């Protein structure tokens, strides 16, 4: 079995899959390396034969995680690294090594699934969009604050905005104008995300008309799902690209 890790800015997304058929044995989201080891170790009758990682962390942090995995599970982790071209997709950055690996692998996965032009909208700590043409050219993309960052900035820099996570969840029962601060903030942030997504869709239409596929991924993808009914929601899109970048037998 293979352990796959997507190490983001705030959390680690993980899953364990069978090598032969990619059936998922277990998975989750954790906020620390130690919590990751504990959750994977808790899976009954799982014996890891490999590990592959995509990380936007520093090299030192990623190396420390690899060492911890080697110690805990006796497997060597394979880390995805930037390349100029892979699987028919050409990296669109002037300095290809500067493109975030999460964005690069999501683009690889999307192009593989779409078999043509595609728009990837990834809504996590940051909101990201990337465009890949029908011939595999990565045309670039956009990054802006995601829901967690928008919410955090308002809570941190506005003294009278204080509420808990349960209140935030209840506030999203609709998107009508808020009648409390929590409703106004949460619904306003969702509308910002939806506006970001709509704008990317219009950019794609200018480029390709209607001949493209939209992919939604990331933890907050459900917040814009209803606004983009034509989109394919692929929660593990980065893992699709990771399997291509780091093949394991």
From Swiss-Prot:
UniProt subunit comment: Homodimer.
Alphabetical keyword list: ATP-binding, Coenzyme A biosynthesis, Cytoplasm, Kinase, Metal-binding, Nucleotide-binding, Potassium, Transferase
Molecular function terms from GO: ATP binding; metal ion binding; pantothenate kinase activity
EC number: 2.7.1.33
GO biological process: coenzyme A biosynthetic process
Cross-referenced PANTHER family: TYPE III PANTOTHENATE KINASE
Record's protein name: Type III pantothenate kinase
Cofactor binding notes: A monovalent cation. Ammonium or potassium.
Function, as annotated: Catalyzes the phosphorylation of pantothenate (Pan), the first step in CoA biosynthesis.
Pathway: Cofactor biosynthesis; coenzyme A biosynthesis; CoA from (R)-pantothenate: step 1/5
Known catalytic reactions: (R)-pantothenate + ATP = (R)-4'-phosphopantothenate + ADP + H(+)
Residues annotated to bind ATP: 6-13, 125
Annotated substrate binding sites: 93, 100-103, 181
Family classification: Belongs to the type III pantothenate kinase family.
Residues that bind K(+): 122
One Gene Ontology CC term in the entry: cytoplasm
Lineage: Bacteria, Pseudomonadati, Pseudomonadota, Gammaproteobacteria, Pseudomonadales
Primary subcellular site in the record, as a coarse category: cytoplasm
Active site per the UniProt annotation: 102 (proton acceptor)
């Amino acid at each position: 079995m293979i352990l796959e890790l997507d190490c983001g800015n705030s959390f680690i997304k993980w899953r364990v899959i069978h090598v032969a058929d990619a059936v998922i044995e277990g998975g989750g989201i954790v906020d620390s390396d130690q919590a990751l080891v504990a959750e994977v170790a808790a899976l009954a009758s799982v014996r890891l034969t490999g590990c592959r990682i995509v990380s936007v962390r520093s090299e030192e942090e990623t190396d420390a995680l690899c060492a911890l995995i080697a110690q805990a599970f006796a497997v060597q982790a394979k880390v995805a690294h930037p390349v100029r071209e892979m699987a028919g997709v050409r990296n669109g950055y002037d300095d290809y090594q500067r493109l975030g690996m999460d964005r690069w692998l999501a683009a690889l996965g999307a192009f593989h699934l779409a078999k043509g032009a595609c728009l990837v909208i990834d809504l996590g700590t940051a909101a990201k969009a990337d465009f890949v043409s029908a011939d595999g050219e990565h045309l670039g993309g956009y990054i802006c604050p995601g829901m967690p960052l928008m919410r955090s900035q308002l809570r941190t820099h506005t003294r009278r905005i204080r509420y808990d996570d349960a209140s935030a969840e209840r506030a999203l029962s609709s998107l009508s104008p808020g009648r409390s601060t929590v409703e106004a903030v949460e619904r306003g942030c969702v509308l910002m995300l939806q506006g970001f997504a709509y704008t990317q869709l219009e950019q794609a239409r200018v480029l390709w008309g209607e001949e493209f596929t939209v992919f939604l991924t990331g933890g907050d993808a459900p917040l814009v799902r209803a606004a983009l009914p034509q989109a394919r929601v692929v929660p593990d899109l980065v893992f699709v690209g990771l399997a291509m970048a780091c093949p394991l037998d």
